[in-house]
Amino acid sequence: ILCWEGYNSDEVLGPFRSANPGATVRAESGTSDPDMINKLRAGEINVWDLINVNQPWARDQLYPENLIKPLSKDRFMPYFDKMLPEFKDYPLSFASDGNLIGLPQRYGPFSFVVNTDKISRDMAEDQGWNLFLDSSMKKKYGVLTYDNWNVMHICLTAGLNPFKPVEGGDRDKFKTTAEQIMGNANILTDDLVAMNTALINGEIDAYFTGGTYTASPARYDGATNVRGITPRSGPVDGKGGVVWIELTSAVNNPDPSNLAEDFLEFVQKPEISKAVAFTEGTYNPVSQMGSDNVMSLFDKDELDAIQMDSLAEEMSRSLDYQVVASYDALIEIYTKARRS
């Protein structure tokens, strides 16, 4: 399995190895959807049986390029009935021809994070991305430098739709906003632990790009003033937040393993769903929490760490993460702004 961290942990792979003695089970974790997809394009379609990436790629690239294959609806559709309401008929799990091409599991709203002792949740949700353009916030925030996400979030801050082409005057607007966001930041780092530490010790009051995934370890350690925020409104159909949802799909390996779909079924089990949610030092909700058998495995502190109290509401205010339309041009502008 080629995956985001979590599926490669001993808590997940150990029990599967025990259940399948004699099988060789190998997992490699990546930190970029495009990089993982490029491995398949470069010939590693012969190596992997499953791929776990965020929601737009299966339908937009992997399936049209024959890098993944349909899953058995008879075998896997019943699992959707046990998921949270927002996943019961999740459109990005299906190709345009109606085939089932991936199963959702981990997910989370991903916009920005504040210290609620300094900026109230209500104010942060109300201000949305404008918070970072406020002159009083100069040098009081950090930027978590996940470049693809920064590009999306700068578009939203500039009042633009990242999933439509950004050209002409809109591109100028993106450039100005990128320069302001990067120029007025106190800290630029891709280390979420360092960012949470700076937030807790008062070095910054908020950070641009972040969410449940990055706030949860600090919250689980007791710093519940670290909170992921989803704006109440925004420039795309009234929405300003973005949500990522991982889909796990079967690679179109010419010499497939019959254990691939067994593993996909295995991670739906309550105790394995819980292990996927809480592993490797970041904690995330999973779609399987629609089942009482899964939900009952989480205690109050764990649910608080992943902000379960507001998740459904935040999801409703978020756009699905999609492929950024003008990515090549925008990443170039963004990189210059970041370096200067």
Model-derived segments and their meaning:
Residues K140-C155, P162-P231:
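Ligand-binding pocket segment of bilobal, Venus flytrap-like solute-binding proteins
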Residues L2-E5, K69-F80, D97-Y107, V114-D117, R121-M123, T224-V242, V251-N252, ...:
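Short beta-strand->loop
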Residues I37, P56, D60-Y107, D122-E125, ...:
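Hinge/lid segment of periplasmic solute-binding proteins
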Residues A305-S340:
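Conserved C-terminal helix/tail region of periplasmic/extracytoplasmic solute-binding proteins
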Residues E246-E314:
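Mature extracytoplasmic/periplasmic domains
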Residues G14, M36-W48, Y63-E65, L131, ...:
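Short helices/loops that flank or line small-molecule/ion binding pockets
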